[in-house]
From Swiss-Prot:
Pfam families linked: Ferrochelatase
GO biological-process terms attached to the record: heme biosynthetic process
EC identifiers of the protein: 4.98.1.1
InterPro entries (UniProt xref): Ferrochelatase, Ferrochelatase_C, Ferrochelatase_N
Family: Belongs to the ferrochelatase family.
Main location: cytoplasm
Any Gene Ontology CC annotation: cytoplasm
The protein, known as: Ferrochelatase
Binding site for Fe cation: H167, E239
Record's keyword terms, sorted: Cytoplasm, Heme biosynthesis, Iron, Lyase, Metal-binding, Porphyrin biosynthesis
Catalytic activity entry: heme b + 2 H(+) = protoporphyrin IX + Fe(2+)
Amino acid sequence: MKSALLLLSYGSPERIEDLDEYLKNIFNGKPVPESVREENLRKYEMFGGRSPSNRIIESIARKLHEKIGDDMDVILAYKHWNPSIEEAVKGLGSYDNIVAIPLFSFYSQNVKDSYLNPLESALRRYGFSPRLEFVNGLANSDLFLPMWANIISEDASEDSFYLFDAHSLPAPDREEDYLFWLRYSTYKISQILGLSRSDFGFQGGHLGWLGPSIYDVLNRIDASKITVIPISFLYDHLEILYDLDYEFRKAVEAKGMHYRRVRMPNDSAMMVNMIERAARSAITHLSGEKINGSIIGQPRIADTDNGR
């Protein structure tokens, strides 16, 4: 039986010259508003013309190959860059088992719509019918909370307010599980580390999306320091380096507060181990009885209701 681990992520251009093609992919071929193009051009120019995300994900893939390469091939695919999900699927015809893991912390319908649906559609178009497990969110792993607790504790400060940050999503009525995992993770990590002052907020949202925004939280707290924990993300990219470390930092410092952000898991040993464990667990599900249907990650509320 031949198996593959398909690592899925958003993707980013390798060169600033590729930005227009990248934005065209995001807008599904529709005209890109000039204001959006200029904003993204400014961001990429600030960071040398590229995001660090692709290199981090490639490093994760290499390290996973060293650990599980004898059992499954590790394949990369991006939602908005190359190789695309469609391109990756072209090479999956010889595989009996496929474990697909989008590199996100929390279960969400948005991830399902954006990654699982295109993956299944592409498999059907090519006439492939492997056994497929889709790991929707890595917060279900027993390594997730210890990983973040370890990162946060590296430079903990009793006089800091801890802001757990997540990417906002549309259609809040469809994202109860996403909100559950954010609340649960905030609660459990604060409990583990004894953080007396903490809350969560969202970034990148629009009217009617999940809230409150991190700016709303900032405006109602009184502290000399704020520590940001981008817990819905797993690796560095421009939404962290620009939106948080540049834009949000300015708002924090304008209130006379000190801004600090914890490091990201990136390609650390705990991160790689967490993905490896999720992949091996999914292969076990494929070879035996499935748990929670074909989508792993959805919370079993009876097991974790005390975190609501």
